[in-house]
Amino acid sequence: MVLTRRIIPCLDLKDGRVVKGTNFLGLRDAGDPVELAGRYNEQGADEVVFLDITASKEKRGIIIELIQRAADQLFLPLTVGGGLRTLDDIQQILRAGADKVSLNTSAVHDPSIITKGAESFGTQCIVVAMDVRRNFTLNPEAVPVRLCDGTTCWYEVVIYGGSKPTGIDAVRWAKEAEERGAGEILLTSMETDGTKNGFDIAVTRAISEAANIPVIASGGVGTLEHFYEGFTRGKADACLAASVFHYGEMSVRDVKEYLKGKGIPVRL
């Protein structure tokens, strides 16, 4: 059986509104989250992701009411992340109507939350999100990744909304997350995020090949072809995008019809 490839709109939330920036900066308003999620539901999105991008940084919990409102109107899986630090936080989000939770900063600080979450709620509920960036300094412990121009670097995990480097190698962290019970990896490259120049194929492929769980490629979509490249060259299981959907440059259906025409299995 051929697994269908998923198209996932991502809604970055700040103060209950959808925002979008470039390279994690310059945020601008993109609309009401429930309204946008409903639109993507109608267009045939496979899932929707809500990420409260300031929750971890500002030590603020996610707005439960917003999730309840969205979950009441959606008929597709909803993943929610941002500011989830404890099992109780995870349980609250799942009870509010989310199908999965995304753990990022908290998982780096306390990797045992991945294991505890998987044991309590099932591996299918636990998505480990990684914000990564290229690092060209010498690191014998890191997994080298060859870039398109032939140079080699390693990818560093960055936390707190992309503001704090950790020294952790992204490929090794992905494998550890899998071993600890993560059901999926949500991978965002800070180099390509919001640029519309395409996914960071080098790191997407490296992590897709290293991990035995689904990898969601994120950061950089600008054209229909970029989705195709994410699946073929990047070997991702799902592709996530934000601004191209939020501002009406293309619809989820446009993407899926294009991919189907190129031989990529999708649910239409």
Curated annotation (Swiss-Prot):
Keyword Cytoplasm: yes
Compartment(s) of residence: Cytoplasm
GO annotation, biological process: L-histidine biosynthetic process
GO molecular function: imidazoleglycerol-phosphate synthase activity; lyase activity
EC number: 4.3.2.10
CC terms in the record's Gene Ontology section: cytoplasm
Superkingdom to which the source organism belongs: Archaea
CDD domains named among the record's database cross-references: HisF
Principal location class: cytoplasm
Alphabetized UniProt keyword annotations: Amino-acid biosynthesis, Cytoplasm, Histidine biosynthesis, Lyase
Catalytic activity: 5-[(5-phospho-1-deoxy-D-ribulos-1-ylimino)methylamino]-1-(5-phospho-beta-D-ribosyl)imidazole-4-carboxamide + L-glutamine = D-erythro-1-(imidazol-4-yl)glycerol 3-phosphate + 5-amino-1-(5-phospho-beta-D-ribosyl)imidazole-4-carboxamide + L-glutamate + H(+)
Pfam families: His_biosynth
Pathway(s) per entry: Amino-acid biosynthesis; L-histidine biosynthesis; L-histidine from 5-phospho-alpha-D-ribose 1-diphosphate: step 5/9
Catalytic residues identified in the record: 12, 131
Homology family: Belongs to the HisA/HisF family.
Function: IGPS catalyzes the conversion of PRFAR and glutamine to IGP, AICAR and glutamate. The HisF subunit catalyzes the cyclization activity that produces IGP and AICAR from PRFAR using the ammonia provided by the HisH subunit.
NCBIfam families from the UniProt entry: hisF
Protein name per its UniProtKB record: Imidazole glycerol phosphate synthase subunit HisF
Organism: Methanoregula boonei (strain DSM 21154 / JCM 14090 / 6A8)
